[in-house]
Structures are given as structure tokens and as C-alpha cells.
A protein has these predicted regions:
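N-terminal targeting/docking segments
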Residues: 14-17, 51, 82, 238-239
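Secretory targeting and sorting signals
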Residues: 13, 20, 30-59
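Residue-level detector of alpha-helix boundary/anchor positions
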Residues: 11-13, 17-18, 224
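Disulfide-bonded cysteine motifs in exported proteins
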Residues: 8, 43, 49-51, 269, ...
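Glycan-processing catalytic domains of CAZymes
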Residues: 57-303
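Intrinsic-disorder-associated, low-complexity terminal segments enriched in Asp/Asn/His/Tyr and depleted
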Residues: 4-9, 18, 22, 28
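Intrinsic disorder/low-complexity segments enriched in polar/small residues
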Residues: 21, 27-29, 178, 233
Length: 303
């Protein structure tokens, strides 16, 4: 996920409502389409139903957030955004923000905590195993790493997630943020970056068929592969300034990059962060747990 040798240098915000991160994971980083009905109708008329297998795209390219848009990161629960915010990222179980560009968070390479037993009971072969035991993300032990090692398994995983994508589209979201692209770095060598790119391309295909843009989450080391091979439309980075990665992203994505810095681990003041010419204009500051405004720990600022 990042241009670092440490495989645990990664996002830490998957479903903040589900649980609090443990101490060891404190600094690990995880995370209303107007006209979508027309796009879906066009797909149906043309016979290109929005399935992973279809290979069909909705008329017109789904658009990323406009460059420079302030996008609030609300994975800890949706709330009325502060003044000046033009978009939000919310969990797939939440609703989009009316009148704002809304991104739907989906965990695409690991299981969600609430779904752990479903995957083990109903599709255990799609969960990566080591010595007969399911392989977990050690920093998020209630998440299992999905087995994207073969084309057949990738296809089935993508089909399982298709309903979530469809729900995001029907709810009125504009885009998908797909998390844990770097899960292969926690696979004990059983998965590769090529596997991740191949699965991501299936997700991008389905998102586009649903009329949704799709964002690469973190993984600066993917370079142009995320854009050119996987088919991502923009990127969401956590702490690109803190870890001196912003230029790695902007070299590929230009202004189509959203960055979230965290108040507990800034490199300098937030004013200094915003003054750095390498930092994208769509940069915000949030508290690590992505709390809502009624929580005393809540933090939100934008450049």
C-alpha cells in the first residue's frame, strides 16, 4: 500500500463503527450520482447488465471529485459536513450526503468483522489459509485476508462484492473507495501485487458498469499500475505528507488525489502541511478514530 519496507505502514480506518484499533495498530492506516438512473437504464437497454462478467461500461466515464474539492472522511459515522465541504467518504452501510459528491467505502481485499463467519462457513476457499488456519490481518485480527491468487477465485470474490457496489449505486453514491489493496503484503508471500491489480480491475469494471468512479486507496508503490491496469479514476491517501509520499501520488493522479492527515501524528503543524507545495489541495485533518462532532476527540480542518 505504501512505498515503505514496513508492510504494516497502512490504513487504519476500516469500519470505525465496528471496533476501536488496538494499541499496536494505533498508527496503522487503513480507510449522489446524478444521472445514474439514466446510465443503468442505458445498460439494460443495451443488454449490458452490470455484472462483473459483462465487460460493459456505463455511457460516459464516471467522474472523480472535482479537483480541489474538500472531502470529509466520515467512516466513523455520517454527520452534516462543515461549511465549505463539497464531498464525503462514508461507509457502504451509510447513506450519501445530499447534494455533495459522495464516496462509498468498501473493504475489497479483506473481510469485514461482521462477515467473518459468513466467509468461513459459506466460502472458506476464498479466504487465504496458512497451515490450515485462516490468515488474519495481525493488526486487525477480526479481518481475514481474501485469497485472490487465481483468476477463478478473484472472479468469485468480485461477484460476492458486487451486491455492495450495486447498493452504493442505488443509494446515490458517486464513487467507490476500495480498501486494503495492499493485503498481499500481509499474505506471507502467497499473494502478489499482480493478484491485487487483477482483482482491482474486476472491481473497477463493476463500479464503472454501475456508473460509479472508483478510487485507489493508499498503495503509492503501485505507481501508474493503479490507473492504467486496474482502472482506478482517482486516489485516496492517508498521511501522504506524514510519510513523504504525496509526490508519488500526484505524479500519477495530479489534482485527483484526496489526502487525510491525522491529528495525533502530524509532521509539523497543519498550517505547515498545507503550505507544502507537494500536498494536494484536497487535504484534510481528522482525528485518528474519525469520530463525529459530538465527540470531544473530533477534529476536522481543511487546507
Amino acid at each position: 500500500m505504501f512505498a515503505h519496507s514496513d508492510p504494516d505502514h497502512r490504513a487504519g480506518c476500516t469500519h470505525a463503527l465496528d471496533r476501536e484499533p488496538d494499541a499496536a495498530a494505533e498508527h496503522d492506516r487503513r480507510a449522489v450520482s446524478r444521472g445514474r438512473a439514466v446510465a443503468v437504464a442505458a445498460l439494460l437497454v443495451s443488454g449490458c447488465a452490470a455484472t462483473v462478467l459483462s465487460g460493459c461500461a456505463a455511457p460516459g466515464a464516471p467522474a472523480p471529485p472535482p479537483a480541489g474539492t474538500v472531502v470529509d472522511y466520515q467512516l466513523g459515522g455520517g454527520y452534516d459536513p462543515p461549511a465549505g465541504v463539497g464531498g464525503v467518504v462514508r461507509d457502504s452501510t451509510d447513506e450519501p450526503a445530499e447534494g455533495l459528491y459522495s464516496v462509498c467505502y468498501v473493504n475489497g481485499f479483506q473481510t469485514q468483522p461482521a462477515d467473518r463467519e459468513v466467509w468461513l462457513d459459506e466460502r472458506p476457499d476464498l479466504v487465504l489459509h496458512r497451515d490450515g488456519e485462516p490468515l488474519i490481518d495481525e493488526n486487525w485480527p477480526d479481518e481475514l485476508i481474501l485469497d485472490a491468487s487465481t483468476g477463478g477465485k478473484r472472479q468469485r470474490i468480485a461477484e460476492e462484492l458486487a451486491a455492495t457496489f450495486d447498493r452504493c449505486a442505488s443509494a446515490g453514491f458517486d464513487a467507490i473507495e476500495i480498501d486494503n489493496l495492499d493485503s498481499y503484503t500481509r499474505s506471507d508471500g502467497m499473494l502478489s501485487q499482480n493478484d491485487a491489480v487483477a482483482l482491482a480491475s474486476l472491481y473497477a469494471e463493476h463500479a464503472h458498469a454501475d456508473g460509479l468512479a472508483i478510487a485507489q486507496k493508499n498503495s503509492a508503490e503501485f505507481g501508474e499500475r493503479g490507473r492504467d491496469e486496474a482502472g482506478f479514476d482517482f486516489a485516496v491517501a492517508e498521511e501522504c505528507h506524514r510519510f513523504d509520499e504525496c509526490e508519488l501520488y500526484t505524479d500519477v493522479w495530479g489534482d485527483h488525489l484526496l489526502d487525510i492527515e491525522y491529528s495525533d501524528d502530524l509532521r509539523g503543524s497543519f498550517a505547515e502541511v498545507c503550505a507544502d507545495p507537494q500536498v494536494p489541495s484536497s487535504t484534510i485533518l481528522r482525528d485518528r478514530d474519525l469520530t463525529t462532532p459530538d465527540n470531544p476527540d473530533y477534529v476536522f480542518e481543511s487546507c
